[in-house]
Amino acid sequence: MCGIVGVVGNTNATDILIQGLEKLEYRGYDSAGIFVLDGADNHLVKAVGRIAELSAKTAGVEGTTGIGHTRWATHGKPTEDNAHPHRSETERFVLVHNGVIENYLEIKEEYLAGHHFKGQTDTEIAVHLIGKFAEEEGLSVLEAFKKALHIIRGSYAFALVDSQDPEVIYVAKNKSPLLIGLGEGYNMVCSDAMAMIRETNQYMEIHDQELVIVKADSVEVQDYDGNRRERASYTAELDLSDIGKGTYPYYMLKEIDEQPTVMRKLIQAYTDEAGQVVVDPDIIKAVQDADRIYILAAGTSYHAGFASKKMLEELTDTPVELGISSEWGYGMPLLSKKPLFIFISQSGETADSRQVLVKANEMGIPSLTVTNVPGSTLSREANYTMLLHAGPEIAVASTKAYTAQIAALAFLAKAVGEANGNAKAQAFDLVHELSIVAQSIESTLSEKETIEVKVRELLETTRNAFYIGRGQDYYVAMEASLKLKEISYIQCEGFAAGELKHGTIALIEEGTPVLALLSDPVLANHTRGNIQEVAARGAKVLTIAEENVAKDTDDIVLTTVHPYLSPISMVVPTQLVAYFATLHRGLDVDKPRNLAKSVTVE
């Protein structure tokens, strides 16, 4: 949610800011703006809508220092007045901010009586506060910023510019992601390494409650009391080809197509030269020491946890419970005596999950993060990390990260099970089975045209739809329904097929689309009974089945894969269903309304 870019040094700041904001579009936003300094001249430009609209307003705007921002409204409507950057009372100071300031109304009442505000955002309160301390109390910019930071409560990433000193950007963070990008003759600030990958692949982390003074030729990290902190840089494993669409019309389609490659990358990452599964021994021991695994996640990652639950339990001999991070952050249930928390997050920045992780660390509960982003907050703050190796996922609707999460957890389950002498784990040839999954996905992807025709007939004009399944297929139905509703805006729900008769079947009427998933030979006939029930009430049914349970009347037939991995192959046609349904409704596949890729506020 939201994005920050900033640059100071020997550069064309306007171009870098616009290009950086374009790279952050995937995070979600409703307005954007930049502030550019060139000596005594400065330019503040804002726009509601896409970055292209902002870019069109920046002709002639030049400078070597600047900050930019994409805003996803939390306080105040999406208007130019509420768009960032924001200025102080005298307009000397300019600030961009990601996060939520919890005590902004208290600050306004206690410190800012008589100040005039152009918008309704908490960010404007913050920059006015900094300006007050610098201009009314005579503090230096650095001391004014520090004093404000000691007062402000909440989650934030700040980038501050003093229009009287174009040689420096001041930044600070707490519970919201922010990085320093290191260039030659210039340095940068960004919410995400992808924003600056065209300029550098060298980055420096900022930890919570740290303040950084960024100049063209230096970066100084301090805590809020002024104590200097040493910080090494790291190299981001990204290149421009990772973040471009290539010949694809949408990132989502590109990322769907990348899933076979992701499966093979995971095999390479978690096997040795002899083809044996290799997972960090410390992670294996952490699972062995636990008497219960608690998976904490949100959205698609939560569904990936459900899809992995049976596999983890059967191969590790450890009970697994699922928790929604946003619920656990405000009250944990009664835990077992030796819990292990596994956090699943594509971005590694999910604020709700981090809230739980902070509490887990305070309680001394060991934790593992499964994420796509090395160096992310959840990765840094958990005891252990497993990476997805899926490459950047730009589309808001997650596809390849979901399948990679299940595959990564399969490697974990296999490694722990083998270490425990679990017979099922020893017999589970994961490398071979995951190779079959990759081939199955490729086969499904070769049938795009057929799937598109069926989807158009079924969903082009509908307002409601249902997915049904049993066992693992029910968990896939949950993810499939989320994918369809979040980008096509079709009201869709995923149900356990056996629950239809307990209430949901009342919603079935003539023409209601019902998509049924069938992969389990033990359960398939029961689901087919439910299909007959909804068909008898007028539903239009589309069936997706694996070959081992398929019938001639099924619409989409998939290669049979190992039951533990069937959610990976079964979900792919449902991703295409969502993609084509959205495409034929004339909607933006990659950027659905009201959604952000990385949810960094609670």
Curated annotation (Swiss-Prot):
Q: Which reaction does it catalyse?
A: D-fructose 6-phosphate + L-glutamine = D-glucosamine 6-phosphate + L-glutamate
The EC number on file is 2.6.1.16
Composition-biased stretches, type Basic and acidic residues, lie in: 77-87
Q: Which InterPro entries match?
A: GATase_2_dom, GFAT, GFAT_N, GlmS/AgaS_SIS, GlmS/FrlB_SIS, Ntn_hydrolases_N, SIS_dom, SIS_dom_sf
Q: Glutamine amidotransferase type-2 domain: from which residue to which, for each copy?
A: 2-217
Q: Tell me, which GO biological process terms does this entry list?
A: carbohydrate metabolic process; fructose 6-phosphate metabolic process; protein N-linked glycosylation; UDP-N-acetylglucosamine metabolic process
Q: What residue stretches are annotated with the SIS domain?
A: 283-422, 455-592
Q: Where does the source fall among the domains of life?
A: Bacteria
Q: Which Pfam families match?
A: GATase_6, SIS
Which regions form coiled coils? none
The entry lists its GO molecular-function terms as:
carbohydrate derivative binding; glutamine-fructose-6-phosphate transaminase (isomerizing) activity
Annotated region Disordered: the residues are 67-87
Where is this gene product found? Cytoplasm
Oligomeric state and interaction partners are given as: Homodimer.
- Read off the NCBIfam families from this record: glmS, PRK00331.1
The name on file for this protein is: Glutamine--fructose-6-phosphate aminotransferase [isomerizing]
The gene from which this protein is expressed is: glmS
